[in-house]
Regions:
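Unchanged
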Residues: 1-129
């Protein structure tokens, strides 16, 4: 399993981002995110919906933050687009669809969410040569 250097979630607004930060902190504390992994939650700029492409460009600009290509050299970065209103699943709107619980547990019996399965799956993909 390959670990990521930076794990980034996108959020539609600051209120959603606060909830995502709490979810990520819990996962770090409970061993679901490997130690040393930098986690970030980045909101759509100006509180306006920008879509996946706009969110990706915003994330790349914030990661580069004046450092240019050096910010990306030799690093594995996962961008998980997770902003949204959960209109079809209102019961999970507060924590976001990406943190919807799934009927399985982690290695130490921790409850898992969709995010945890996404992270496990993409971490198993080989790193580029």
């Amino acid at each position: 399993m390959q670990n990521f250097d930076i794990l980034i979630l996108t959020a539609a607004n600051e209120a959603q981002a606060e909830g995502y930060r709490a979810q990520l902190a819990w996962r770090c504390a409970n061993g679901l995110i490997p130690p040393g992994t930098e986690t970030r939650v980045i909101t759509d700029p100006g509180g306006r919906r920008v879509g996946s492409l706009g969110a990706t460009l915003n994330v790349l600009a914030q990661v580069a933050d004046g450092r240019g290509e050096v910010a990306f050299a030799g690093r594995r970065i996962l961008i998980c687009h997770s902003g949204g209103d959960s209109r079809r699943t209102p019961a999970y709107a507060a924590q976001g669809k990406v943190f919807t619980p799934v009927p399985t547990t982690g290695p130490a019996g921790q409850p898992l969410a969709l995010f945890d399965l996404i992270l496990r799956t993409v971490s198993a993909l080989p790193a580029p040569a």
